[in-house]
Amino acid sequence: MPVGTEAIRKVDFLAGTGNRFVAEGKRQLFGEVGIDLFAGPTESLVLADETADPFTVATDLISQAGHGPDTPAVLITTCPKVGRETIEIVNKLLSATDLSTPDVAKVSWDAFGEVIIVDTLKELWELGDHYASEQVQVFTKDPRDALDKMSNYGALFLGENTCVSYGDKVIGKNHVLLTRTTARYTGGLWVGKYLKTCTYQEVTSPESSGKLGRLCGRAARPERFEAHARSGDLQANRHM
């Protein structure tokens, strides 16, 4: 696609999800063609208070850890009891024999799983924003508070009725999202990525062109761009 064939014209832009091999392909082709963004392994973050159900938290963390052996699955909670019970349930679920990816999920959880206890909801929102995770589930009494309290994430999943697996499979969530804290400064794939801006300049007034020419000379010479200055001088001498 990026180089074309005898039958297919070379493309100008590559977009879409993929594993680490797709990401490496994009990296190597960056500059040869445009790309949507560089995305790392899937990330899942759960923000929970004392109202959260530990079994639901554990189930959803494992569902995402099964994506690959390098998938971060993190719980931040204000409730130590929720944290402890989540860890216990995760370990039990990972020992189940009916999971299709238990070994993958266990490797991921052992290497990248985290359970963090904070004292207040304020700390919960702040630390969640600091993580800037790809997918953030909010299991709090008022999950919509996250819309006002947070700004760094790929996608929010509000309430225990909204699991990340829905986003993966059935509710049409954007699948090209930010990972590795890049949500701190940009957003995921959107329609603007498929558009480009073209501009043009035209000075229609000779007098204005002359005045701009004098200004151009004064701006260019201190920077030692004499050729720039002379281009402006030409217009100034012609029209002033």
Swiss-Prot record:
<dbReference type="GO" id="GO:0000105">
    <property type="term" value="P:L-histidine biosynthetic process"/>
</dbReference>
<comment type="similarity">
    <text>Belongs to the histidinol dehydrogenase family.</text>
</comment>
<feature type="binding site">
    <location>
        <position position="228"/>
    </location>
    <ligand>
        <name>Zn(2+)</name>
    </ligand>
</feature>
<dbReference type="GO" id="GO:0046872">
    <property type="term" value="F:metal ion binding"/>
</dbReference>
<dbReference type="GO" id="GO:0005829">
    <property type="term" value="C:cytosol"/>
</dbReference>
<feature type="binding site">
    <location>
        <position position="64"/>
    </location>
    <ligand>
        <name>Zn(2+)</name>
    </ligand>
</feature>
<dbReference type="GO" id="GO:0004399">
    <property type="term" value="F:histidinol dehydrogenase activity"/>
</dbReference>
<keyword id="KW-0862">Zinc</keyword>
<keyword id="KW-0479">Metal-binding</keyword>
<feature type="active site" description="Proton acceptor">
    <location>
        <position position="134"/>
    </location>
</feature>
<dbReference type="GO" id="GO:0051287">
    <property type="term" value="F:NAD binding"/>
</dbReference>
<dbReference type="Pfam" id="PF00815">
    <property type="entry name" value="Histidinol_dh"/>
</dbReference>
<protein>
    <recommendedName>
        <fullName>Histidinol dehydrogenase homolog oryD</fullName>
        <ecNumber>1.1.-.-</ecNumber>
    </recommendedName>
</protein>
<dbReference type="InterPro" id="IPR012131">
    <property type="entry name" value="Hstdl_DH"/>
</dbReference>
<feature type="binding site">
    <location>
        <position position="168"/>
    </location>
    <ligand>
        <name>Zn(2+)</name>
    </ligand>
</feature>
<comment type="pathway">
    <text>Secondary metabolite biosynthesis.</text>
</comment>
<keyword id="KW-0560">Oxidoreductase</keyword>
<dbReference type="InterPro" id="IPR016161">
    <property type="entry name" value="Ald_DH/histidinol_DH"/>
</dbReference>
<comment type="function">
    <text>Histidinol dehydrogenase homolog; part of the gene cluster that mediates the biosynthesis of oryzines, natural products with an unusual maleidride backbone. The two subunits of the fungal fatty acid synthase oryfasA and oryfasB probably form octenoic acid. This fatty acid is most likely activated by the acyl-CoA ligase oryP to give octenyl-CoA before the citrate synthase-like protein oryE catalyzes condensation with oxaloacetate to form tricarboxylic acid.</text>
</comment>
<feature type="binding site">
    <location>
        <position position="67"/>
    </location>
    <ligand>
        <name>Zn(2+)</name>
    </ligand>
</feature>
